[in-house]
Amino acid sequence: KNYRDVTFSEKIEMMSLLQTHYYKKKYIQYKPLSSNVFPYFENQVDNSYISLFYKNKKMVGLISGRPLTVNLNNSSFITYYVDFLCVHSDHRKQNIAPELIQTHYYNECYKQPSILTCLFKKESHLNNFVPLIVYNTYTFNMKNWITYELHSCVNIININSKNIHILVDFIRNNKHKYKCFITCSISNLLKLIETGNIYVYCVIINKKVYASYFFRNTSTIYFNKKSIECFGTIQDCSDLLFIYAFSNIAYYFKENYLFITIENISNSSTIIENIVKKHKYLYDTKTAFYFYNYATYPLKKEEYL
């Protein structure tokens, strides 16, 4: 169903399912609040969709889809990102997940014929399909990280509704560097920033932007401590400035987060290579994105953002 038709009681059931059954390992837990889930579907230009699976009037599965704009191979199109796929642990291996995916995609296309593709993300256990991209995601403990001092002319700003135009202009001027550039709408990005789900920082010298860093509150707990994720970076400066500025942002996050995961895409390899010279990573997770109903050659990690 359309996200705006989801009832309050359904949202409560969704949160109960996600909090209890979405992702749980011995030392890693996914603990979202409703404010970490529903803003992803709000302030969208196009519709978002939720599919729910019931057994004996009890919700045992859910899946969602929300619109993203893809710039790939010199063309632009809308895809629907499949997220929050969750099946109750007592009902797994009953073919519920494949049925959810197939039914969800069919209903999306039926209600909105312009939907031609979907985008999936997989971690650890990858599919045998041809991926859009495969890369590694690294998890670090930031406790002993050092911070590099920046020159007084360097400013790091936190992006918000008042200065979002700075980021928009920087992206417009730099997205040609990547063969594939995928974004949500600006209105949705602002909603995610306002609700503390996304953080974006820009490095500015003399009113010119030289780098941007994108972070996500993943609601994931490692060893009972919160974590933050760097899911993308854009570099238009020296490696030294790029690394030093990142260290200052990480220092800020250390007040509230002990762990950080960094996806090795776009320009982030420069940061990761510097970190692993001094610190060991806790986890190295194979990660991939897949298109459904769209064929393309796999990208290199630095070609994707």
Model-derived segments and spans:
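Amide-forming acyltransferase catalytic core, primarily the GNAT-like/NAT-type
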Residues: 2-48, 54, 123-230
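Eukaryote-biased feature marking scaffold/signaling PDZ-domain proteins and nuclear chromatin regulators
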Residues: 9, 46-48, 60, 77-80, ...
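Catalytic micro-motifs at enzyme active sites that drive phosphoryl/nucleotidyl and oxygen chemistry
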Residues: 38-42, 66-74, 108
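Conserved GNAT-family N-acetyltransferase fold
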Residues: 51, 63, 85, 213, ...
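Fungal eukaryote-biased detector of long internal structured cores
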Residues: 53, 65, 78-81, 88, ...
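Acetyl-CoA-dependent GNAT
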Residues: 55-58, 64-73, 215-221
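Conserved acetyl-CoA-binding loop-helix of GNAT-fold acetyltransferases
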Residues: 87, 92-106, 237-252
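Active-site/acyl-donor-binding loops of N-acyltransferases
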Residues: 115-155, 211-240, 244-305
